């Protein structure tokens, strides 16, 4: 820093008077230097945070398409959109206060995955463990434990699914209904609610359809505490997307 000050003094002597210097004294130069150091440190922190986020997201099951989803970049075109964004944001911000699960119900392409991913991204940035899995992948992983060569048992897999801070199960109702699928989802929801951990569900089915598919017991568990049920009852946004917009 002393060298910078000496250089500034020499520069003042040789610079023509009509040229206005950026710094008029040693204090201004010192302040600028400190500010540049602060900006550089913040840039490094942001880069490290982004790299960490990418690694965590890779393990969270959040698809690449949704990794940049936030509450701020959700397209709001009417009051329904505004309502679900506000409710989802409030859910994420109050996550630590009590156990609360959520169900996002509605047509495909209405923003359920966007807001579920926004919740997941927010919680991950705040140090929470998050996992999103489709029912198809969930059942595939469960069935893979039946293989005698697999080191992961069904019990261990269920424990892992029960221990993340927020588990989100996607595409409920997309599969051909099976009793075993219902039993597995029931076990997961039961274990998680018993340990006061939140679960999220995404489905194209309405309340009646989900109740028939999963049973009243599961739906009751999902509605414990300050749980959230949002209905996305508008047309698909994807119909309005052209070319590279998506």
Curated annotation (Swiss-Prot):
Catalytic activity: ATP + H2O = ADP + phosphate + H(+)
Enzyme Commission code(s) on record: 3.6.4.-
Enzyme class of the recorded protein, top EC level: hydrolase
Record's signal peptide: none
CC terms in the record's Gene Ontology section: primosome complex
GO molecular function annotation: ATP binding; DNA binding; hydrolase activity
The keyword Cell wall biogenesis/degradation belongs to this UniProt entry's keyword annotation: no
Keywords per UniProt: ATP-binding, DNA replication, DNA-binding, Hydrolase, Nucleotide-binding, Primosome
GO terms under biological process: DNA replication, synthesis of primer
Record bears the keyword Transferase: no
Probably involved in the interaction with the DnaB protein, annotated site positions: 69
Complex formation: The helix loader is a DnaB(6):DnaC(6) complex with a crack opening large enough to allow ssDNA into the central cavity.
Entry function: Required to load the replicative helix DnaB onto single-stranded (ss)DNA, to initiate chromosomal replication. DnaC alters the inter-domain and inter-subunit interactions of DnaB, inducing an open ring conformation that allows ssDNA to access the interior of the DnaB(6):DnaC(6) ring. Has ATPase activity only in the presence of DnaB and ssDNA. ssDNA binds to the central pore in the DnaB(6):DnaC(6) complex, making contacts with both subunits.
Family, per entry: Belongs to the DnaC family.
NCBIfam families: PRK07952.1
Name of the protein in question: Replicative helicase loader DnaC
UniProt source species: Buchnera aphidicola subsp. Baizongia pistaciae (strain Bp)
